[in-house]
Every structure is written in C-alpha cells, then in structure tokens.
Amino acid sequence: MWRLKIAAESGGGSGSSPLLHTGNGFLGRAVWEFDPDAGTPEERAEVARLRRDFTRHRFQRKESQDLLMRMQYAKLGHLQPDLSAVIVEDNQNVTEETILSSLRRALNQYSTLQAHDGHWPGDYSGILFIMPLLIFSMHVTGTLDVVLSLEHKREICRYIYNHQNEDGGWGTQVLGQSTMFGSCLNYATLKLLGEALHNNDALAQGRMWILSHGSATAAPQWAKIWLSVIGVYDWSGNKAIIPELWMVPHFLPIHPARFWCFVRMIYMSMAYLYGKKFVGPITPTILEIREELYNIPYSEIDWKKARDCCAKEDLRYPCSWIQDIVWTYLNKYVDPMFNVWPFNKLREISLRNLMKHIYYEDENTKYIGLCPINKALNMICCWIEDPNSDAFKRHLPRIYDFLWLAEDGMKAQVYDGCQTWETAFIVQAICSTGLVDEFSTTLEKAYGFLKNSQVLHDLPNGKSFYRHRSKGSWTLSTADNGWSVPDCTGETLQALLGLSKISPKLVGDPIKEKSLYDAVDCLLSFSNKDGTFSSYECTRTASWTEILNPSESFRNIVVDYPHVECTSSAIQGLISFTELYPGYRGVEIESCIKNAVMFIENKQQNDGSWYGTWGICFTYGAFFAIRGLIAAGRNYENSQAIRNGCKFLLSKQLSAGGWGEHYSSSEIEVYVDSGSPHAVNTSLAMLALLYSGQIERDPTPLYRAAKQLISMQLETGEFPQQEHVGCFNSSLYFNYPNYRNLYPIWALGEFWHRLVASKD
C-alpha cells in the first residue's frame, strides 16, 4: 500500500538522496511512497473498492475525494468525541445550537487531517498537462525507470485513463472539453509509460480523437514545444523563441526581466531548448508515436504550415495581425540569422547566459522550481549541459514533491502544494469560531508551521537575476520553494497577528517582532506605485508587451497585473499590523492602504460584482473585495461599493439558500449560475455579507445559507468535494484541497460568533 510521508519523514524512502537539501527540515513536504508490506487484506480491499467506485462514476463525478489520505489519517486512531449528525428538516429553522453542533463536528474531524508538522496536506491538482511534462523530462534524460517504480507508473496510467473524456480525448484540465493540448500530451505519456495501441480501446479512441481534430499539427504552442523535445514534432513547426531576447538592454520594456515571473521562468528554459533545437532519443516508441499522431507520414508534413495551425478547441486567444507580423519576422529573418556565423557566436553567449539563470533558479528553490513546468524544463536543460552533474541529479528527488495519490490514481500537482496559503486561512477560520480553547492544540501546531515557514533571507545577488526581495515573506507552499508571494505574506501575517492575541499557554509563543517587521517591509516592497499588489512581483512593464505572448491557450501572461484579491490580502495584513504596531512605517502603510482601496473600488463592475482572477469567480472576488474594504474602514453605510456588492451577491442566492457559480464565469467574465449550491461559493458569499453587517440589516439570507451548508455536511463532519474552485489565467481550473472545509467552517463560525455577540 501507499503511505503519505510528511516533512522530515519524506527525506527517507523514495525521496532519500544525499542530493536532497532543505532549509528547514522539509517542513510542509508531502511525499507518497509505496510499501509492498503495508496494509491488511481488508485495507487493500477497501482501496481497490474506492478505485473501482471512482472509475465507475468518473463521467458524473470528475473530482476525486482524496480518500486514500483520509484512510491513512483515520487509521492513526485520533480520538474523536461521538458527535451525532446535525439534521435540519425543511420546515425547521437553523438555531445557534444547530450551528455550534455543526461547527464542532466539522472541527473535530478536520483537526484529525492536520499533519504532525502543522499543515493540512491535500490534492492540489486538476491540470492534465503537468504530469506529461514531468514524464517527458524523465524520458529524454533517461531517468524514467530511476524515478518511477512500476507502482508509480501503474497509478499514473490509472489517473490518465480515469480522466479521459467520453469522446476519447483529454482536456487541458479535469474540468472541460477535450483539447489537442491535453489529448496529444496524455496519449504520448501513456505510450512512454509502456502502454500499447494494440487491443487498447482507450488509446485507440484517444488517437481517433486526435486525428479527427486535425492531428498533432493542430496542437497549441506549448504542446508543440514539448512534442518537439521528445522528438514527435519538428522544431521548424514552432514559433521562434529567441534566446537573444535576454541580451537586450534591461531598461527596455521587452526585456524578459520585466515579464510576469511564470512566463519569464518557463520561456527562459524554452528559449534554451529552442536555441539548441534539442531532441531527445529517437526510440522505437517515439517512432510509433510519430506514426500515430498524424494523418499523413511524418516525413511529408509541412512544418511551416503547421506552425500557425491550432485546433478550434484550443484556440482560446487567437494571435492578432500584429503578432502574426512579429512571429513571421522572427521565424523568417531573426532566428535564421543567429544560426550562421558570426551571429551564431551571440547565440552561444545567449545560451550560456540562460543557463546561468537556470542554475540560479534551481539552487535557490532547492530544485523545486517556481512550478512543475519550469522545473521539468530546467531539468532537461541541466541534463543537456552535463548528464552527470549535481545540477541535474538534484532535480530527481524533488519530482516526488509534485506527485499526489488519490482514488483516481497518481496525478501531478499544480505547484509543490499550497501549504502556507491554506494554513493561514484555516487559522483565521478556526479563530473566527470563538472555539479557540477547544482546538488550541490544532492552532498551536499550525502556528508553529507558519512561524517556521517564513523566508528568512534575501537571495544572494537577487537583482542580477531579476528576483524581488524575499526576506520576511511567505511562499504559497514551503520555505524551500523560495518564491515570495504578496497575498500569501499578507494572509499569513494576518493569521499570525490574530494568534498573537491569544494566550501563549494555549497556542505557543508569539512570533518575534523582528519577524513581523521583516514581513511588513517585504509587503511594502511589493506595492506598486499606485498602491496595488500583483501576484508575485511588482508590475514591471506595460500591457502592450502582450504582443510577445505566442500562446493561443493563455491570455495576459506577459505582465504581472495587479489583482483585487492580491491587493485585498496584502492591505489586510498591513492593517492588522498597524492595529498592534502603529508606530512602524505608519505613513507609508496609510498611503498604501488609501491607494489600494481606490483600486478595489474602481475595479468593481457596473452590476456590483468584482472579477476574481485566482478563484471561481465573482463570489471569490466579492469575498476579497468586501473584506478588504471593511478592514480599511469602509462599511455598508458609507460605501456605495459595498452596498452594490452586497446587492449583487443577494441577487445570485439560490432558492435553496446557497450559491453555485460555474467555472465558465472566469472565461466569459459574466456570472454563470451552476444551478446547484456549492459549499465554497456559498461560504464566500456568506462571509462577504457577514463582514458587511448583513446580520444587523436582515439575517434571513444568512440563516438560509447556513441551513444549506449544514444540510451539505457529510456524516464524517466534513463538507463535500465539489467542482474545482481554483483558477489560473482565467482558463485553468484546479483543486484547492482544503477550501471544501475551511470556508464552510469560517462562514458558520463567523455567523455563530456574531449571533452570540449580538445578544450580549
């Protein structure tokens, strides 16, 4: 059976390596390892049943429930009080006692899912092209059998087959229609893992979907690059990615140092591979894939024509005529020029420069990388430079950081986790309930995790490598990851300051003041000139540089734009800090908050909604916007924005009492009602209304929402896993594993706490 290993435990077994380094004892790291001797016959039979059940219902319920982790944690034998289920009949009203009973059931169960290091592990997945990238990187470097056991491969294949759509194709993500992106990459992955087309109906259907939709020549840009790397698509069929762009003067808006960090880091290694025109080993399997992905013989394909071809299922953001001119010029004139003397010397210099940056990124993220995409790319680049180098070998044990196992199989996470981000919210959720005394042990462990996950140092020579300040910040995941995130820093700061108000006898010693000052200094450094906050760094360039985005799949990826959610989280952290430490950088903080509030108000749409970029979508945006405005001193009476926001939310409440927003809201930028209540959407809307003072105006919508949440609560005390609510670039949807529990707990806790307070 498989076992989940946490923190220092994860340094052994499959993750064991003298090349595996950490800065804080692997805090937050979660690795699945296979133990052939583990488990009783009954436990193994239960795992098999859960897997069969998922496969049987996979087209009706695409989201896994993370049941294998829950099985393991249940076996640990945590003692739980015998709390009976809360049942509210249709003709009954919710009472304070009902809410409190529901809360206790939820928190008692949820506390048992906390890891010993203080965070809550879970399945942070949902994007279907990430595992193929990791498999491709292991294939071309010859390490597939070194890193992955037969059990790994079996579970990865299970996952890919489970998430094949009924039409035979695969989507870009678990949610949504089949695309050439998802289909080509997952088909090739199955082949590389040893699956054969002969007598394999699933592979045959996948191939049929690909061929009937234009073949792999109609794949989008990112897919074409990866297919080129493994040798089943020719590099001449790609839009040029010029390595020399990194050599232009830094002050120019088009220098990649000014791009959003994800695009900068991903295209950095893509540019290296393009400049090298690197192709992995041409094995018999690769030759088979060449035959199976196209309607005509591989040798007869017109690669230049294929360059601009993209299937309609993948063509989300067509190139403009200006972009067409740019890429034609780069492909026809610029790239060929750098392949002949004397300009090829500049290409060699450019490639060496890129490798210098790639090595720096790897070393300063403990070989985790910013994300699994640039990690997989960097790993290949390091192997090309020297297959025997530590720089390459250190990548291998960190692959496990991205693998997660559930009843639907083994999948790749979208990051190395969201440990810090979710733990900060969980702390705030538990504190909102007023039940701190009962769950002080849970809070104490979470407190320790957050305190010990702070980034303590700036990166050496960071400016030369385009990196922002990091000292005092928190990352999305672990300190080892190393990439500072403004909103994660803001929310964690807020959680820590809330805990500092509680007796140390209950939750442990407070964080040091110096650490708080470092956090505030770092937060203020993230502020744009207009007081707004972007996702990772300050906005560094103008929106017109989006003409350099060659991707048909993703929009607005060149610039790190400011966002309502990021801005709200950042200023809430600053506001919480000034309440306790009013004398530290007060003038700067006040100015920042003033400008940030203006930004949030100005981003409100005519119908009273706020667009949420990092979650689904308008309920998510409203929660952060209203919460941020309230923290800054606005209220329902003095803020038209808050009144309009509340009116918008109330207009979307379903007759049953909850809210249900479909993920397509993010794509079309209009609220799309899913028709059924979603626990997370309901909780976010409920919290926004609570913060605005809805309980004093008319508590009826809140009682209806609370009744809906309680009716959704499972027998275990948890809330159901429903449609994914994480979003990236308005086009990729994935799962935040703890949202399903933390937000309902927060909403019910805040409601109960305010009901009690209103009667005192």
From Swiss-Prot:
Major place of residence: membrane
GO biological process: triterpenoid biosynthetic process
Record carries keyword Amino-acid biosynthesis: no
InterPro entries in the cross-refs: SQ_cyclase_C, SQ_cyclase_N, Squalene_cyclase, Terpene_synthase_CS, Terpenoid_cyclase/PrenylTrfase
GO molecular function, one term: intramolecular transferase activity
GO cellular component, one term: membrane
Residue spans of the PFTB repeats: 153-194, 642-688
Membrane topology value: Single-pass membrane protein
Signal peptide residue numbers: none
Subcellular location: Membrane
Keyword field: Isomerase, Membrane, Repeat, Transmembrane, Transmembrane helix
Matching PROSITE patterns: TERPENE_SYNTHASES (PS01074)
PANTHER family noted in UniProt: ACHILLEOL B SYNTHASE, TERPENE CYCLASE/MUTASE FAMILY MEMBER
Family from the record: Belongs to the terpene cyclase/mutase family.
Protein name per Swiss-Prot or TrEMBL: Achilleol B synthase
Organism: Oryza sativa subsp. japonica (Rice)
